[in-house]
Amino acid sequence: MAEITASLVKELRERTGAGMMECKKALVEANGDIELAIDNMRKSGQAKAAKKAGRVAAEGVILARIGAGFGVLVEMNCETDFVAKDAGFLGLANEVADYALANKGVTIEALQAQFEEKRATLVAKIGENMNIRRVQFLDGDVVGSYLHGAKIGVLVAGKNADEDLLKKIAMHVAASRPEFVKPEDVSADVVAKEREIQVAIAMESGKPREIAEKMVEGRMKKFTGEVSLTGQPFVMDPAKSVGEFLKESGADVTNFVRFEVGEGIEKVESDFAAEVAAMQKI
């Protein structure tokens, strides 16, 4: 039985867009063969199989705004990275973010309706599909933000902290992609699924189920730490956990939001050879 490492799971997550649990299970079933795992996930519909259909707006930008006691993230999409850097597109995206800041709690439907005329005009001018995809607000005593190249946006809410400290935590969230704030926040169903996977791994090595179940208890504590913010090694000082850094600072994190451009959207597979052949005919 091949060892299912964290780096292998991370690579599969990045390549398929599937969740951590699905990726671990697929790797176990494929005995650590990532290419086989991807094939199996595509067959079962877990992975987002690339399709040549439609004009998918999967590029774009993430914008962040901070108000009094809250923050907001907005994602606006277009078809190509080239247009994502266009002044007209960025101008509209910033208008949308400013409007969301000034109208706390606005729904995505209301936001889309507010800017539909401008969006349609810009689509006609540039010739690419684009849309306001999502908006999310985060309340907190203090809220910090971080944008990574306009492709990843994070908001972090905390107590007894300043925006600079929360920005550092937001940078960690951008890089390490935690799913929960604290280990105790990991839901029972997520823990149960992981336990079954770990038991299956132990049983594959020849251990009886009773022994395997006892073996995985220690692994479960490690797992809940890996998927939670406070349990992860702090990216700015890996010798300590985020939780230890916060404790030393006398601060606490209450919640966070992480957006990444295009996550969850099926991107059109580009056939480079066909594109080159088509260009030769022009």
From Swiss-Prot:
Region (Involved in Mg(2+) ion dislocation from EF-Tu), start-end ranges: 80-83
- Give compartment(s): Cytoplasm
SUPFAM superfamilies noted in UniProt: Elongation factor Ts (EF-Ts), dimerisation domain (SSF54713), UBA-like (SSF46934)
Task: Fetch the Gene3D superfamilies from UniProt.
Answer: 1.10.286.20, DNA helicase RuvA subunit, C-terminal domain (1.10.8.10), Elongation factor Ts, dimerisation domain (3.30.479.20)
Keyword flag Iron-sulfur = no
**Record's keyword terms, sorted:** Cytoplasm, Elongation factor, Protein biosynthesis
Q: Which GO terms describe its cellular component?
A: cytoplasm
What's this protein's family per the entry? Belongs to the EF-Ts family.
Recorded hits in HAMAP family, A to Z, give:
EF_Ts (MF_00050)
Give the matching NCBIfam families.
Answer: tsf
Identify this protein by name: Elongation factor Ts
Q: Which species is listed as the source? A: Pasteurella multocida (strain Pm70)
Taxonomic lineage from the root: Bacteria, Pseudomonadati, Pseudomonadota, Gammaproteobacteria, Pasteurellales
Gene, per the UniProt record: tsf
